[in-house]
Amino acid sequence: MSVMYKKILYPTDFSETAEIALKHVKAFKTLKAEEVILLHVIDEREIKKRDIFSLLLGVAGLNKSVEEFENELKNKLTEEAKNKMENIKKELEDVGFKVKDIIVVGIPHEEIVKIAEDEGVDIIIMGSHGKTNLKEILLGSVTENVIKKSNKPVLVVKRKNS
């Protein structure tokens, strides 16, 4: 029985470890991989934290509701993600992949698992740690939860040793 990984899910938070994982995604082209689902999840919990923080500081504006502020923040974060993903998408297309890019707002590990299922990917390739990169822990919480909850194979790429 031969295992083929034709369709890859590459979730990124644009961290250094995610960049290292991208190199591994590209290497799968030599193994006949054809398509990459490029995913960025805007963490809805972070948006809620920023809402509270901004309201406490009063920078949300006197005439804005929490909902308006939340929508502005989601739009801003989505626009930033689109710009970063455009470069990654081009890199992947340059090595011959068909690329579908997705940006969603939600709980990162839940969205990664859901999109892996919805898109019918063969493997998930992701970094071991995200932006927090706590050195004391073996795996980041998003990666750990994806491993626990997904029925897809997960290739976890380690961060650089420091």
From Swiss-Prot:
GO terms for cellular component: cytoplasm. Binds 1 Mn(2+) ion per subunit. InterPro entries: Rossmann-like_a/b/a_fold, Universal_stress_UspA, UspA. It is found in: Cytoplasm. Keywords: ATP-binding, Cytoplasm, Nucleotide-binding. One of its GO terms (molecular function) is ATP binding. ATP binds at residues 11, 41, 127-133, 141-143. Its cofactor is Mn(2+). Its main location: cytoplasm. Homodimer. Belongs to the universal stress protein A family. This is Universal stress protein MJ0577.
